[in-house]
């Protein structure tokens, strides 16, 4: 008997992890698998890893590749969804990578690729926190910062498929070096990587015997994550609070710039750090409200947590793209 619904699969190719998930008709992830990205390494090896985690996720869902209607791959950087080529990705160290062709050879099913934050924005617009909005922006906090912009219900990707690289606006002149080659980019300060670096810097300034942040990482500074400082704040660590306050200040700086330029109805924040919920969002909103250009309260941008996971919105982008082929 034929299945009435063909499942879809989303792959999030990040600078740190590759995550694949099978998604059902309710946009729910029913199974997923992951591995480390381990860049830099050859394109063929990355494709092998993506195919491997995809098949593992399908197996966990007790399905076969024949049950998968389409696969969407979300990638940071300049992505041409029409040609299936990743033209440039600073955090993955790739130029002109024909990822769709290589993945279709491995999995023998329909595949599309999209900038991960564009996919996030579309997913939130179609089925998430931005559903019903006319204009929306999604940012993803990960190895870098991705940005996706919806204007009048359509993704804005610019003339070279590299629009909305919001993480690469400079917020500190001659500041920290970014993977893109510039200095002072927003993502060098406000990405998960930026928070991890701030946390490590604070730990190195502390007395190791009394560092709650270090103790929470079993004394290994290399185990610091984006959660470390937040967890330490909840335990009453004043040094950790200083880290979080500085981090949220950097994050707010970029958000105010974005809101002043675009004035979206909703701005959704995704990525692992967004799981901190109101511990992140409440102080963030306070700063944005104080610094935004528009001061009247009749219609202000709503800042909220993205409600869909990465693999969910990459599958949605695949569905929308392939539906129009």
Model regions: which residues?
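A short acidic/small-residue loop/turn micro-motif
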Residues: 36-38, 94, 162-165
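Short beta-strand segments
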Residues: 72-76, 138-144, 148-150
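A charged helix-plus-loop insertion that forms the helical arch/lid used to bind
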Residues: 85-95
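Short beta-strand-to-turn element immediately C-terminal to the catalytic PLP-Schiff-base lysine
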Residues: 23-24, 123, 148-152, 156-158, ...
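Short hydrophobic alpha-helix segments
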Residues: 33-35, 90, 159
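A short acidic Gly-Thr/Ser loop motif
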Residues: 12-16, 140-144, 162
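ATP-binding/phosphotransfer module of carbohydrate and carboxylate kinases, centering on a glycine-rich
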Residues: 2-70, 80-83, 101-109, 126-133, ...
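General beta-strand structural signal in soluble alpha/beta enzymes
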Residues: 111-115
């Amino acid at each position: 008997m034929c299945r009435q619904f063909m499942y879809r699969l989303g792959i999030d190719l990040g600078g740190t992890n590759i995550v694949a998930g099978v998604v059902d008709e309710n946009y729910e992830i029913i199974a997923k698998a992951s591995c480390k990205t381990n860049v830099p390494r050859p394109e063929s090896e990355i494709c092998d890893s993506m195919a491997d985690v995809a098949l593992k996720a399908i197996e966990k869902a007790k399905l076969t590749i024949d049950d998968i209607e389409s696969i969407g791959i979300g990638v940071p950087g300049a992505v041409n969804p029409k040609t299936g080529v990743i033209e440039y990705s600073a955090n993955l160290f790739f130029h002109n990578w024909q990822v769709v062709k290589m993945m279709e050879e491995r999995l023998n099913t329909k595949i599309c690729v999209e900038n991960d934050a564009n996919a996030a924005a579309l997913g939130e617009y179609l089925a998430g926190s931005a559903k019903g909005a006319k204009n929306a922006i999604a940012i993803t906090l990960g190895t870098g910062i991705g940005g996706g912009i919806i204007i009048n219900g359509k993704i804005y990707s610019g003339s070279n498929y590299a629009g909305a690289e919001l993480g690469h606006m400079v917020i500190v002149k001659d500041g920290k070096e970014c993977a893109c080659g510039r200095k002072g980019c927003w993502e060098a300060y406000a990405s998960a990587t930026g928070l991890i670096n701030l946390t490590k810097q604070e730990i190195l300034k502390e007395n190791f015997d009394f560092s709650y942040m270090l103790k929470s990482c079993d004394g290994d500074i290399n185990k610091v994550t984006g959660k470390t400082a937040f967890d330490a704040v909840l335990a009453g660590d004043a040094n950790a609070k200083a880290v979080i306050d500085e981090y949220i200040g950097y994050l707010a700086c970029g958000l105010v710039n974005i809101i002043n330029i675009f004035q979206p109805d909703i701005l959704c924040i995704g990525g692992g750090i967004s799981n901190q919920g109101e511990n992140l969002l409440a102080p963030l909103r306070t700063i944005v409200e104080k610094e935004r250009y528009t001061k009247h309260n009749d219609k202000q941008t709503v800042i909220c947590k993205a409600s869909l996971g990465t693999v969910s919105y990459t599958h949605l982008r695949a569905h929308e793209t392939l539906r129009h082929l």
